[in-house]
């Protein structure tokens, strides 16, 4: 049977024939008794809601369908529309089989509350168990728990949820509504304001950019409450609210176990899934934990985990990912792309990711190409390693942090801006092909644990043998049954766009140089007064972006400011040389390791032989990165 096939196959859903077999089973048996019922629930989707429209019902429905269709790549399996007076709610669903059941928008048993959700509630069982009044779910979707949570706790219900989500709850009893976004902004959400006074919510900007007079990113960790016609913050963790520095000493065992729990929570899946594996520390830890848990779980739906990496031929990431995959035992897929394939995809990437930020586009393009192949292989969910650098100070420029206070403030600012950069890239580039990305490093509980650690423990101190993300590496550096090879566990940080191949960035610069004339660039401020491009590459992306999204409101959804190796502007003051570096890539600070250790900690290279092995092991990687950069330029 198809069910047995899933259990024994070395590759999930390798052909359309298997999916058709599954669909046939769903037609022959009730969903309640089907052994594949757990694979039916909707997950990563696209949502659109319009409240207070002045249009007649027929025109409102037509407008709703038009906007929702632009989100169909996020949920290509089924569409659901509901009109309630002058309000419209639409849902584009990603499902495995039997698209006629479990559709959204969904309602409570009394048909009073309507939910339209995109995301994943990992603690849905706990939410149901803690309800003051028992609730019998109508479907197998974890997101349905939002409805009884709202009925039980009112506007405070998001505090009871753990996951990644953006959703709208409409209460027909008083014609009120609440929109909500998760604590970090892992899933995208925008709010728009129509000329007729209507309020819009959409998973992506493209659903509302030509229908709303103005729009903006919905702030993470907030709800929009129609009763006050404004935002209210629901996420108030201690690391944000406290004015002094956290002082908890690092407990390596507790840190490791906390992250393992975060990964395992995200292995809850209704679909065939895999991991994105660059070969760097973050994604490698995620993959290793997944494999360990699957090996220990006799009921694991698939016998082996599939991992995926992308890069130009002979790129650093492909080599490192293969090494990790061989160590942990995944079925690995190295996906090579050519520079021309990347260039051909740039316009589509900007359309899907909805940004003109240079580093985001550089990194999104190979991820976009990889996601297309992942979807073609039958995978609909992947785990990824985004967020670790923001939580542990993993970017190379953190070597220049002058003190613990500056280090911690930069971490907080980076986390607060994740929804505009890495989360935006990871979600939109991957979901552009109907694949759901999950990011365990941004788990609610793990984040509070990691951000409660004394920042002095996270700082880079070569005289103490501490390289970037030292405490994370140390937490997983075990001798018995090691998680990763030492060469990977202590490998230097690479930005994703660097790791896939240095010539990718150099070619992008060359193309921009050819496309954007000196005269065009000289008058950049006249054409783009907001976030004026500082390089020809930035001008090139901005030009494409405004052809797709011509509204001034669209440009203002993208953050600006100068950056070095993904820094915020505040960190530019850490080193005078940052102001003169012309590239936003991590390559711009490739030599920062030696400089920072020597200048910041007054440690001479001649004394490096006395440093701990972990710090010494990092130098070859840094040297190799600089050598490859020089070769690429030559």
Name each model feature, range by range.
Residues 252, 310-374, 397-409, 425-429, ...:
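ATP-dependent adenylate-handling ligase core
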Residues 40-44, 376-383, 402, 406-634:
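Adenosyl-5′-phosphate
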Residues 2, 17-19:
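Acidic, Ala/Val/Gly-enriched low-complexity intrinsically disordered segments
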Residues 31-34, 40-41:
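Cysteine-centered motifs
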């Amino acid at each position: 049977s198809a069910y047995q096939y899933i259990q024994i196959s070395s590759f999930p859903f390798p052909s359309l024939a298997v999916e058709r077999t599954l669909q046939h089973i769903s037609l022959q048996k009730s969903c309640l008794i089907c052994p594949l019922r757990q694979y039916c629930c909707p997950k990563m989707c696209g949502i659109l809601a319009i409240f207070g429209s002045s249009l007649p019902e027929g025109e409102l429905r037509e407008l709703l369908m038009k906007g929702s269709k632009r989100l169909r790549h996020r949920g290509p399996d089924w569409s659901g529309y509901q009109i309630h007076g002058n309000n419209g709610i639409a849902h584009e669903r990603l499902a495995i089989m039997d698209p006629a059941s479990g559709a959204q928008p969904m309602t409570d048993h009394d048909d009073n509350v309507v939910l339209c959700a995109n995301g994943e509630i990992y603690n849905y069982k706990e939410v149901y168990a803690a309800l003051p009044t028992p609730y019998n779910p109508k479907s197998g979707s974890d997101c349905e728990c939002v409805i009884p949570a709202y009925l039980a706790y009112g506007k405070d219900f998001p505090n009871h949820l753990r996951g990644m989500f953006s959703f709208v709850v409409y209460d027909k009893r008083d014609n009120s509504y609440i929109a909500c976004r998760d604590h970090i902004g892992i899933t995208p959400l925008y709010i728009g304001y129509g000329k007729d006074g209507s309020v819009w919510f959409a998973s992506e900007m493209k659903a509302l950019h030509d229908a709303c007079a103005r729009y903006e990113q919905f702030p993470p960790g907030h709800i929009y409450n129609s009763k006050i016609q404004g935002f209210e913050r629901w996420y108030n963790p201690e690391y944000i609210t406290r004015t002094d520095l956290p002082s908890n000493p690092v407990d390596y065992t507790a840190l490791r176990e906390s992250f393992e729990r975060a990964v395992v929570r995200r292995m809850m899946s209704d679909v065939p899934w895999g991991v994105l594996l660059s070969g760097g520390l973050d994604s490698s830890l995620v993959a290793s934990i997944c494999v360990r848990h699957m090996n220990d779980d006799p009921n694991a739906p698939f016998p082996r985990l599939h991992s995926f990496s992308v890069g130009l031929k002979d790129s650093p990431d492909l080599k490192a990912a293969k090494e990790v995959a061989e160590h942990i035992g995944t079925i690995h897929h190295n996906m090579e792309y050519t520079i021309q394939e990347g260039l051909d995809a740039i316009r589509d990437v900007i359309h899907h990711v909805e940004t003109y930020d240079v580093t985001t586009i550089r990194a999104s393009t190979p991820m976009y190409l990889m996601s297309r192949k992942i979807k073609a292989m039958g995978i609909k969910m992947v785990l990824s390693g985004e967020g670790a650098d923001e939580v542990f100070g993993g970017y190379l420029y953190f070597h220049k942090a002058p003190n613990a206070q500056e280090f911690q403030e930069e971490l907080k600012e980076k986390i607060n801006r994740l929804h505009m950069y890495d989360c935006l890239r990871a979600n939109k580039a991957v979901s552009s092909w109907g694949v759901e990305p999950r990011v365990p490093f941004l788990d609610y509980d793990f984040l509070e644990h990691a951000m409660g650690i004394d920042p002095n423990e996270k700082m880079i101190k070569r005289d103490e043998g501490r390289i970037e993300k030292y405490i994370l590496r140390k937490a997983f550096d075990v001798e018995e049954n090691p998680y990763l090879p030492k060469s990977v566990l202590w490998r230097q940080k690479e930005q994703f766009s660097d790791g896939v191949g240095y010539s990718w960035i150099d070619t992008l610069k060359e193309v921009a140089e050819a496309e954007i004339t000196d005269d065009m660039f000289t008058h950049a401020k006249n054409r783009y007064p907001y976030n004026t491009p500082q390089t020809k590459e930035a001008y090139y992306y901005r030009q494409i972006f405004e052809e797709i999204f011509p509204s001034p409101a669209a440009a203002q959804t993208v953050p600006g400011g100068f950056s070095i190796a993904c820094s915020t502007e505040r960190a530019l003051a850490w080193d005078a040389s940052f102001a003169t570096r012309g590239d936003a890539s991590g390559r711009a600070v490739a030599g920062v390791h030696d400089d920072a250790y020597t200048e910041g900690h007054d440690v001479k290279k001649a004394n490096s032989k006395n440093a701990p092995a972990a710090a010494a092991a990092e130098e070859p990687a840094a040297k190799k990165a600089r050598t490859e950069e020089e070769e690429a330029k030559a």
